From Swiss-Prot:
Pfam families: IRK (PF01007), IRK_C (PF17655). The keyword Lyase does not apply. One of its GO terms (molecular function) is inward rectifier potassium channel activity. Residues 392-425 are annotated as: Disordered. This is G protein-activated inward rectifier potassium channel 2. Residues 117-140, 160-168 are extracellular. Associates with KCNJ3/GIRK1 or KCNJ5/GRIK4 to form a G-protein-activated heteromultimer pore-forming unit. The resulting inward current is much larger. Interacts (via PDZ-binding motif) with SNX27 (via PDZ domain); the interaction is required when endocytosed to prevent degradation in lysosomes and promote recycling to the plasma membrane. The modification Phosphoserine is found at residues 18, 25. SUPFAM superfamilies: E set domains, Voltage-gated potassium channels. It comes from Mesocricetus auratus (Golden hamster). Residues 141-152, 153-159 dip into the membrane without crossing it.
Length: 425
């Protein structure tokens, strides 16, 4: 009996489980691993003191990108583009590779010259005047190394000279001459490209330390200033700006460091600059602007970064130059303007770069551009309603009277017609 009851209970349990599986099959849902930025952003909704959090820059003030590439498995790709790899190295590593390449090639061919002399037996007939060696006066590895340097650098033979009785030496001489020319072209080319890089030219392109938000021509604008310290100008200069801000889509996807274009005059051509003196770059905050709904009180709470990029060709070399900088929320001043730096002197304009980064406070509403537009619309609406509403009300009353009293309207029309006939008579 006990075994029968146990068997019956087990079957009931199995049948119940199978029915449950038929009704509702459990599915193991694996939550995707959030990016590190998203995991860091999760407790921010609970934290009240968000303004004190340090915002991690995407681009530093000096223009260097604050991004490190990790877990790169396909490192062979760096060797396929060996020229760019060498140019991107620091100067100390570049000079070390430069010296090592020449030293290794000299030692390699010096070893081969010594082996040829050793195999031919030239070392055993150094003092024999009747013996014709492959290379005269080559009596050891040091002399072979010096002969290799003389051959590859083409400084001219002196005490050691190759003879015509050594065909293997002649072939080796041709190989070393060709490979030496290739090494010279490659290494000198790398050094020339590294020296002529326009990165240092970007050091003389300066951006203001702060960006400002104030009114300009009755519109709320975001502004920053750029300048060129050199007398040789940047040709075909253009500027653009990006807003770096993490976002979450309506489907729940988290996009870290989402990039949004900031219009600084692309459609009007104001983004193309004649950068002879410092210029103030302006972005009008309108409905297409990402700052449309941001007010003065909300700005410190936002976690965003504005990346500005200035590009152009160096007048002296014709190479493309790019300068970058960025502004975080703590570097955006609401209600300020830049101090003028350009003054007219006797026959020329003078730029005072001591005041390049200075700002002064000005009267600016603390509302967002959206709120200002709504207030402006509310101020204009009663003027239009006062005329149109009265006309509509008058028309509606007339139509209602006509619908209610159609007979009276016909009698009035008849009376008017009789009066006209009597007046004619």
């Amino acid at each position: 009996m006990t075994m029968a009851k146990l068997t019956e209970s087990m079957t009931n349990v199995l049948e119940g489980d199978s029915m449950d599986q038929d009704v509702e099959s459990p599915v193991a849902i694996h939550q995707p691993k959030l990016p590190k930025q998203a995991r860091d952003d999760l407790p921010r909704h609970i934290s009240r003191d968000r303004t004190k959090r340090k915002i991690q820059r995407y681009v530093r003030k000096d223009g260097k990108c604050n991004v490190h590439h990790g877990n790169v498995r396909e490192t062979y790709r760096y060797l396929t583009d060996i020229l760019t790899t060498l140019v991107d190295l620091k100067w100390r590593f570049n000079l070390l590779i430069f010296v090592m390449v020449y030293t290794v090639t000299w030692l390699f061919f010096g070893m081969i010259w010594w082996l040829i002399a050793y195999i031919r037996g030239d070392m055993d007939h150094v003092e024999d005047p009747s013996w014709t060696p492959c290379v005269t006066n080559l009596n050891g590895f040091v002399s072979a190394f010096l002969f290799s340097i003389e051959t590859e650098t083409t400084i001219g033979y002196g005490y050691r000279v190759i003879t015509d009785k050594c065909p293997e030496g002649i072939i080796l001489l041709l190989i070393q001459s060709v490979l030496g020319s290739i090494v010279n072209a490659f290494m000198v080319g790398c050094m020339f490209v590294k020296i002529s890089q326009p990165k240092k030219r970007a050091e003389t392109l300066v951006f203001s330390t702060h960006a400002v938000i104030s009114m300009r021509d009755g519109k709320l604008c975001l502004m920053f200033r750029v300048g060129d310290l050199r007398n040789s100008h940047i040709v075909e200069a253009s500027i653009r700006a990006k807003l770096i801000k993490s976002k979450q889509t309506s489907e729940g996807e988290f996009i870290p460091l989402n990039q949004t274009d900031i219009n600084v005059g692309y459609y009007t051509g104001d983004d193309r600059l004649f950068l002879v003196s410092p210029l103030i770059i302006s972005h009008e905050i309108n409905q297409q602007s990402p700052f449309w709904e941001i007010s003065k009180a909300q700005l410190p709470k936002e976690e965003l970064e504005i990346v500005v990029i200035l590009e152009g060709m160096v007048e002296a070399t014709g190479m493309t130059c790019q300068a970058r900088s960025s502004y975080i929320t703590s570097e955006i001043l609401w209600g300020y303007r830049f101090t003028p730096v350009l003054t007219l002197e006797d026959g020329f304009y003078e730029v005072d770069y001591n005041s390049f980064h200075e700002t002064y406070e000005t009267s600016t509403p603390s509302l967002s551009a959206k709120e200002l537009a709504e207030l402006a619309n509310r101020a204009e609406l009663p003027l239009s309603w006062s005329v149109s509403s009265k006309l509509n009300q008058h028309a509606e009353l007339e139509t209602e009277e006509e619908e209610k009293n159609p007979e009276e309207q016909t009698e009035r029309n008849g009376d008017v017609a009789n009066l006209e006939n009597e007046s004619k008579v």
